[in-house]
């Protein structure tokens, strides 16, 4: 797709070739935010795949990832096509880009619901679980940038990040993550958090 921020157009292509995925591969890709699969945009779903799955109205963040995780149970085949099919406009002043004092709580709730789903449906599958922990660690890094170090955060310091890293769900994700499917800069940051917080 084309991502448009103000007047700048950036073509986003996560993979160059067409690819076919089974249910597990789709779920693993959905749990890795840097693949782009966890978002609900960029997709066309067969109505039978969606079935009775709906967005969780109790979540304010992460509801799209949970939706993708839940429909993965109904997927027999997913096909990726590396073509620009639409324009995705980014609103730089949107609500998700503003400082939110409840940011950590919103992500914690989403992580708790995600964990419950993954453990109930894939608790014995190590490959799924490690990707879930990587998903959690990735979101701790988002919290570090968008909350702990946000210019409007009055607690803006390492203490804020330490508090976040000591929340059990986040601590577990950091500890059990394996650096897979994240960029080098995020790997370095995650390594620092794992060994210094």
Language-model regions, residue ranges each:
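Donor-binding/catalytic cores of nucleotide-activated saccharide
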Residues: 1-79, 86-103, 123
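Solvent-exposed aromatic/hydrophobic patches embedded in short alpha-helical segments
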Residues: 44-45, 135-141
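Short, charged, amphipathic alpha-helical segments
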Residues: 127-134, 157-161
């Amino acid at each position: 797709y084309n991502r448009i921020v103000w007047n700048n157009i950036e073509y986003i292509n996560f993979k160059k070739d067409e690819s076919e995925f089974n249910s597990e591969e789709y779920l693993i890709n959905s749990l890795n935010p840097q693949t782009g699969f966890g978002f609900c945009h960029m997709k066309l779903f067969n109505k039978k795949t969606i079935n009775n799955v709906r967005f969780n109205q109790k979540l304010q963040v992460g509801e799209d990832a949970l939706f993708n995780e839940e429909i993965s149970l109904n997927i027999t085949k997913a096909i990726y096509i590396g073509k620009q099919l639409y324009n995705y406009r980014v609103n730089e002043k949107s609500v998700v880009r503003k400082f939110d004092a409840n940011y950590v709580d919103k992500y914690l709730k989403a992580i708790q619901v995600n964990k419950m789903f993954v453990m109930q449906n894939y608790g014995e599958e190590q490959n799924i679980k490690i990707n879930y922990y990587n998903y959690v660690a990735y979101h701790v890094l988002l919290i570090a940038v968008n909350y702990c170090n946000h210019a409007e955060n009055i607690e803006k310091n390492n203490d804020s990040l330490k508090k976040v890293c000591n929340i059990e769900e986040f601590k577990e994700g950091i500890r059990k993550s394996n650096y897979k499917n994240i960029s080098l800069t995020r790997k370095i940051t995650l390594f620092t958090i794992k060994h210094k917080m």
